[in-house]
Amino acid sequence: LGDVYKRQTLDSTEIIVLATAGGLFLIQIIYYLCLYNRIHARSRAVKQGDTHFTQELPPISVIICAREESENLRRNLGAVLEQDYPQFEVIVINDGNTDESEDYLTILEEKYPHLYHSFVPDSSRYISRKKLAVTLGIKASKYEWLVFTNANCMPQSNQWLRLMARNFTSRTQVVLGYSGYERGKGWLHKRAAFDNLFTSMRYLGFALAGSPYMGIGRNLAYRKELFYQQKGFSAHLNLQRGDDDLFINHVATPENTRVETDANAIVRMQPLLRAKDWKEEKIGYASTARLYHGMQRWLAGFETLTRLAFHASWIAAMVIGILHFHWLAAGVAFLLFLLRFTMQAVIVNKTARDLEEQRRYYFTLPAFDLLQPIQSLRWKWYCLFRKKSGFLRK
């Protein structure tokens, strides 16, 4: 009887590990319910008519920066030019002259009188070419409201501009939209698609919670006046990146920022084919994330830390329980994992459905849940040891 009693009594190590797993579980629950569920909650509120939008449709300047992307322009530009919107112009800034982009844009201008294009001079040396392209597009624009996307992005409907514009209230200066991938095959694309979805749930979730801290230029709008008030990119002119995320980090406030989550306001990119492209994109954002103002960066990092610690603690508690024949302790540890997984699967997949992502995450979710923060730490670690000159303008 004494041996049985000892087997059922948890030692101090088991109690500490199990209590740690329980505490980390509660932290993760708070993050999912209060942050990652925001997009789904907003989508539901919009459907129920609980969100205010403006009825005005001010003229818009759409700015697209393309770097030798004639194929992307042929594929995607038509969907931008044929938006159902009363008054807008499309400005394409072409960086590079080694492909057919220039000829194609010249021909297209004859069909679409609201299309204009310019180019980045080859001699430009004192500002990153992307920031120069954005600046040239803004200076060439006629209208106050600027909407940005990339040449490799296609709006999912002709209502994209109308849905972005319904957020252009008198107090609004910044509108953040969602950009995703078209469905593709392969492990690389699946990882990138989940990372993109989860990253969007995070930064759009913060914005919907009243704490905007970044934006992505694939689907973004702001006022021209705001750009000039900030003297363009002067605050980080020495960096290659930062034309979208770092700029929005400096200008976005709870009062001046709104988020558009309608599925018809989404732009999508083609599936990833090369790991190098994804790596460069992630490293680029990791290099500017170090300069973000506000607590959001640290709160996001804390979620990553508690996620990894939770997985380590529940696994440790279950293994120790099994080795000591404490089946109740092992069962409680596994139950914590199961409860978090269930809540996570519900929120992630509801958000994916709201954003019309074609992929759902069930059996692959635990793997992506571990890989995503490890990948994030990998990019940050790479930035830490990469020469600073690699992130400066050339």
Q: Regions from the language model: what does each represent?
A:
Residues L1-Y5:
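Short, small-residue-biased leader/transition segments that mark boundaries at the very start
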Residues K6-T54:
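N-terminal membrane-anchoring/stem segments of glycan-assembly enzymes
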Residues A41-K47, E69-E82:
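Short, well-formed alpha-helical segments that are part of the catalytic scaffolds
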Residues Y112-A133, G137, Y143, L163-S234, ...:
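Long helical/loop segments within the catalytic core of UDP-sugar-dependent glycosyltransferases
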Residues Y143-M154:
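Short beta-strand-to-loop acidic/aromatic patch adjacent to the donor-nucleotide binding site
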Residues R307-S389:
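Membrane-embedded multi-pass helical conduit in multi-pass membrane proteins
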